């Protein structure tokens, strides 16, 4: 196993521990807690894949961070902060919406680009809106936390979420996953619209009539993929 992979995991475990302490002391906001829960799942998945104990990894990560801080200067810190862009966190969904349990009568799942797409194919003839929580860097979607599809009465009928045990995903991975989700829901004559944030930061467009965010060419391509899978 690559030593850098182990070191990275150990440091991630310790930094998560520090963030957890902040949360326990009520020193953070809702997006911070949201990322904390997501990263906990990711660390458990990585630990299982690597065969490493989280507690031991956290202690080793503490030693690594302490050694780095001993040699760190204020000037180096200023340079690092100045050269690093600051990602923004976009929240279409409330904590209740993103954490609510939901169930499928006719479940369908697909893995694409490190993302899990889930949808209930029993849903028919509904008006559905897509909402997502994600980070933005350089005015473009960087990391998806969760995307869910809601009916007009608030029921959850589909979801896209990162797979904790797999490496990260790209903006294109998210676009493809949304295309699969839209195609699957439209198969049953549902009407889909995406939130303005999804349209703006995933595709760089604003759809004034609230229609699906996919460009026609890509939407047709995704629909054909879904038809062949169904």
UniProtKB/Swiss-Prot annotation:
<keyword id="KW-0945">Host-virus interaction</keyword>
<dbReference type="InterPro" id="IPR009068">
    <property type="entry name" value="uS15_NS1_RNA-bd_sf"/>
</dbReference>
<keyword id="KW-0694">RNA-binding</keyword>
<dbReference type="InterPro" id="IPR038064">
    <property type="entry name" value="NS1A_effect_dom-like_sf"/>
</dbReference>
<keyword id="KW-1103">Inhibition of host pre-mRNA processing by virus</keyword>
<dbReference type="GO" id="GO:0030291">
    <property type="term" value="F:protein serine/threonine kinase inhibitor activity"/>
</dbReference>
<dbReference type="GO" id="GO:0042025">
    <property type="term" value="C:host cell nucleus"/>
</dbReference>
<feature type="short sequence motif" description="Nuclear export signal">
    <location>
        <begin position="137"/>
        <end position="146"/>
    </location>
</feature>
<keyword id="KW-1192">Host mRNA suppression by virus</keyword>
<keyword id="KW-0832">Ubl conjugation</keyword>
<feature type="region of interest" description="CPSF4-binding">
    <location>
        <begin position="180"/>
        <end position="215"/>
    </location>
</feature>
<dbReference type="GO" id="GO:0039502">
    <property type="term" value="P:symbiont-mediated suppression of host type I interferon-mediated signaling pathway"/>
</dbReference>
<dbReference type="GO" id="GO:0030430">
    <property type="term" value="C:host cell cytoplasm"/>
</dbReference>
<feature type="region of interest" description="PABPN1-binding">
    <location>
        <begin position="223"/>
        <end position="230"/>
    </location>
</feature>
<dbReference type="InterPro" id="IPR004208">
    <property type="entry name" value="NS1"/>
</dbReference>
<keyword id="KW-1114">Inhibition of host interferon signaling pathway by virus</keyword>
<keyword id="KW-1113">Inhibition of host RLR pathway by virus</keyword>
<keyword id="KW-1262">Eukaryotic host gene expression shutoff by virus</keyword>
<feature type="region of interest" description="Disordered">
    <location>
        <begin position="208"/>
        <end position="230"/>
    </location>
</feature>
<keyword id="KW-0922">Interferon antiviral system evasion</keyword>
<keyword id="KW-0899">Viral immunoevasion</keyword>
<keyword id="KW-1088">Inhibition of host RIG-I by virus</keyword>
<dbReference type="Pfam" id="PF00600">
    <property type="entry name" value="Flu_NS1"/>
</dbReference>
<dbReference type="GO" id="GO:0003723">
    <property type="term" value="F:RNA binding"/>
</dbReference>
<protein>
    <recommendedName>
        <fullName>Non-structural protein 1</fullName>
    </recommendedName>
</protein>
<keyword id="KW-1102">Inhibition of host PKR by virus</keyword>
<dbReference type="GO" id="GO:0039524">
    <property type="term" value="P:symbiont-mediated suppression of host mRNA processing"/>
</dbReference>
<keyword id="KW-1190">Host gene expression shutoff by virus</keyword>
<keyword id="KW-1048">Host nucleus</keyword>
<dbReference type="GO" id="GO:0039657">
    <property type="term" value="P:symbiont-mediated suppression of host gene expression"/>
</dbReference>
<comment type="subunit">
    <text>Homodimer. Interacts with host TRIM25 (via coiled coil); this interaction specifically inhibits TRIM25 multimerization and TRIM25-mediated RIGI CARD ubiquitination. Interacts with human EIF2AK2/PKR, CPSF4, IVNS1ABP and PABPN1.</text>
</comment>
<comment type="similarity">
    <text>Belongs to the influenza A viruses NS1 family.</text>
</comment>
<dbReference type="InterPro" id="IPR000256">
    <property type="entry name" value="NS1A"/>
</dbReference>
<dbReference type="GO" id="GO:0039540">
    <property type="term" value="P:symbiont-mediated suppression of host cytoplasmic pattern recognition receptor signaling pathway via inhibition of RIG-I activity"/>
</dbReference>
<comment type="function">
    <text>Inhibits post-transcriptional processing of cellular pre-mRNA, by binding and inhibiting two cellular proteins that are required for the 3'-end processing of cellular pre-mRNAs: the 30 kDa cleavage and polyadenylation specificity factor/CPSF4 and the poly(A)-binding protein 2/PABPN1. In turn, unprocessed 3' end pre-mRNAs accumulate in the host nucleus and are no longer exported to the cytoplasm. Cellular protein synthesis is thereby shut off very early after virus infection.</text>
</comment>
<keyword id="KW-1090">Inhibition of host innate immune response by virus</keyword>
<feature type="region of interest" description="RNA-binding and homodimerization">
    <location>
        <begin position="1"/>
        <end position="73"/>
    </location>
</feature>
<dbReference type="GO" id="GO:0039580">
    <property type="term" value="P:symbiont-mediated suppression of host PKR/eIFalpha signaling"/>
</dbReference>
<keyword id="KW-1035">Host cytoplasm</keyword>
<feature type="short sequence motif" description="Nuclear localization signal">
    <location>
        <begin position="34"/>
        <end position="38"/>
    </location>
</feature>
